[in-house]
Amino acid sequence: IHQDDALEKETLQTLQTSPFNKIRFCVFPKSYEFNENEPREFAFCKDAEGNWDVDHPNYKFWNHLEEVISQLQEMDIESDLILFHPYDRWGFSKLAPEQNETYLRYLVRRLSAFPGIWWSMANEYDLCFAKSKEEWYKIEEIIKEEDVYDHLLSNR
């Protein structure tokens, strides 16, 4: 969801003819080898000071994410969403606990109606140094509390 339209289209076309039935991808963009581009949209709008405002979701981003999840679902491919990761240059890995809670409650309430969703709390959670063990427990509690459909949940 954080690549250009051509690569996203190619990926979806490739998946359509592949044997895969689950794909993992991140809600937040990654800054990593082969992921150096600037995403077209981010999950949140910015406030007047240029900081992420988790109270103001960027609906273009969320609508696009839902569109991709729907396309995957039509191909009988489940979406394993990675909710946090350490490969960040935009500041999402360093959101305050109350910001993480706002983000998670919005995400789970919005996406849990999709039957083919898996929640991966993090990719390499042990490298997310900004979060304490207690914060990970709280993240798990929030997801379980908000997900009335009880989708699969993992820490990796």
Kindly label every feature range from the protein language model.
Residues 1-156:
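Active-site mouth of glycoside hydrolases
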